[in-house]
């Protein structure tokens, strides 16, 4: 199974069907970002996630975003070990914003 996708791969998946996004950025520092219509974005700061696992559904696949995709890669491994289906989006919201601007 592929545990990471590029922004372009993520956008192709999101264009086909609604996706579940887990935005792990600090709410005080970062603005939320908008995805394709119908996508579900859950914002939980990275530092709070271990205490918020009850908000996640093990039957869903989540695409993880941090600002640059580094911290989300580490958290993806943690969540997989906890039984969740997660995929890291390489480059995070920075790459996502660059993709939209191009």
Language-model features, listed with the residues they occupy:
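Rhodanese-like catalytic fold shared by cysteine-dependent sulfurtransferases
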Residues: 1-19, 27-61, 70-102
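Short, surface-exposed ligand- or partner-binding patches at beta-edge/loop junctions that are enriched
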Residues: 64-66
């Amino acid at each position: 199974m592929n545990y990471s996708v590029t922004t372009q791969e993520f956008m192709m998946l999101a264009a086909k069907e609604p996706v579940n996004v887990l935005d792990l950025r600090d709410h005080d520092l970062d603005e939320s970002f908008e995805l394709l219509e119908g996508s579900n974005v859950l914002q939980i700061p990275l530092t709070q996630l271990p205490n918020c696992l009850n908000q996640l559904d093990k039957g869903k696949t989540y695409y993880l975003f941090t600002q640059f995709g580094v911290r989300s890669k580490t958290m993806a491994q943690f969540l997989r070990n906890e039984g969740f289906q997660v995929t890291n989006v390489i480059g995070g919201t920075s790459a996502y914003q660059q993709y939209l601007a191009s």
